[in-house]
Amino acid sequence: MFDRIEDAIEDIKQGKMIIVVDDENRENEGDLVMAAEKVTGEHINFMIKYGRGLVCVPMTEKRLNELGIYQMVENNTDHKETAFTVSVDYKECTTGISAFERALTVKKLVDDNSKPEDFTKPGHIFPLRAKDGGVLVRAGHTEAAVDLAVLAGLKPAGVICEIIKDDGNMARLPDLLEFAKKFGLRIISIEDLIKYRMKNEILVRRVAQAKLPTKYGNFEIVGYEEILTGKQHVALIKGDVNKEPVLVRIHSECLTGDILGSLRCDCGDQLHAAMERIGQEGGILVYLRQEGRGIGLLNKIKAYHLQDQGLDTVEANIKLGFPPDLREYNIAAQILKDIGVKKIRIMTNNPQKITELSDYGLDVVERVSIEICPNHYNEKYLKTKKEKMGHLILEV
């Protein structure tokens, strides 16, 4: 359905437009997107005539500050936090509204020789302030446009325009696919762009390393930090991990289960079972800071409250406005690659974890089951994981 990110990047490099689609649970929209430094009056005219949305120019915060172009409002109450700045025109434009004068303004925004006094305000071009870190920080069209320009080796700025149907309603995916076919444009998703960046960029750095004696044996503990977010994770290494395939457990943080001994889940039991087996056989335990299947500790406690009222773990997440599972494993894959591991035997009951690790370039040669005997408090939880989340659990 969607084109390859590599092909889209090549089109951006050549000055072509593409269509970028965001998540159906977000805006569920498609934008025409191209590199700002490649724009012409013809491109702007196409966007106005066929896209029909608002022509905007996503740029970095650094560049906008250099040009003295600041936020449109001090308190941004837009529900998607789209960071509009004051609109601008290039000072030598007449009205600034024609397709060709708008293109001139865009070109001057990315011209290294431009100065703040070269622009009049307000105008007819709407710069947007992209978040540092791009789509890995905010999964919006603003960040996607800047990311694509950078990946194409161009200046970090794009031109975007929403696609609206003939009847005035927003074009959704079926309409966008038809639009792409009609005009011969590539179409990609922001989700695929996120995966591309996660797979091809280094997003963690090794910060510290020390010996860690435990009741399961003597481990080496290695501390990692995510470059974009500062979030911290650790890996416990036992024995020689140069002999592949390596036994691996990727464990997501669970304060209530891992530390407080909660009987509501099987997390603590799984953690200690994994440490014991790795302590005996050698291997790696990656401990990820994504509490509550990614929704955070306080939201997990809210989910517990809903479960006390009869909802299951999936229903509780959805009631709170979250997917059943928000966890991601790209950081774990990068940690394993940093350690030098590529071929693994993964201790998990979660097939999605295997799929994601494989997508990020690891060779998963075996799934090692990690069965925990259910108790009165977590039996419903385990059944829900098995029946609704596809976990390969035999004991319930």
Swiss-Prot record:
Its cofactor is Mg(2+); Mn(2+); Zn(2+). The record marks 124, 162 as: Essential for DHBP synthase activity. CDD domains: GTP_cyclohydro2 (cd00641). InterPro entries: DHBP_synth_RibB-like_a/b_dom (IPR017945), DHBP_synthase_RibB (IPR000422), GTP_cyclohydro_II (IPR032677), RibA (IPR000926), RibA-like_sf (IPR036144), Riboflavin_synth_RibBA (IPR016299). It comes from the Bacteria. Coiled coil: none annotated. In the N-terminal section; belongs to the DHBP synthase family. GO terms for cellular component: cytosol. SUPFAM superfamilies: RibA-like, YrdC/RibB. Residues 200-396 are annotated as: GTP cyclohydrolase II. The keyword Ligase does not apply. Its EC number is 4.1.99.12, 3.5.4.25. Mg(2+) 2 binds at residues 27, 141. One of its GO terms (biological process) is riboflavin biosynthetic process. D-ribulose 5-phosphate binds at residues 26-27, 31, 138-142, 162. Catalyzes the conversion of D-ribulose 5-phosphate to formate and 3,4-dihydroxy-2-butanone 4-phosphate. Catalyzes the conversion of GTP to 2,5-diamino-6-ribosylamino-4(3H)-pyrimidinone 5'-phosphate (DARP), formate and pyrophosphate. GO terms for molecular function: 3,4-dihydroxy-2-butanone-4-phosphate synthase activity; GTP binding; GTP cyclohydrolase II activity; magnesium ion binding; manganese ion binding; zinc ion binding. NCBIfam families: PRK00393.1, PRK09311.1, ribA, ribB. The lineage of its organism: Bacteria, Bacillati, Bacillota, Clostridia, Thermoanaerobacterales. Mg(2+) 1 binds at residue 27. The keyword Kinase does not apply. Residues 1-199 are annotated as: DHBP synthase. This is Riboflavin biosynthesis protein RibBA. The active site is at 325 (proton acceptor), 327 (nucleophile). Pathway: Cofactor biosynthesis; riboflavin biosynthesis; 2-hydroxy-3-oxobutyl phosphate from D-ribulose 5-phosphate: step 1/1; Cofactor biosynthesis; riboflavin biosynthesis; 5-amino-6-(D-ribitylamino)uracil from GTP: step 1/4. Zn(2+) binds at residues 254, 265, 267. The gene is ribBA.
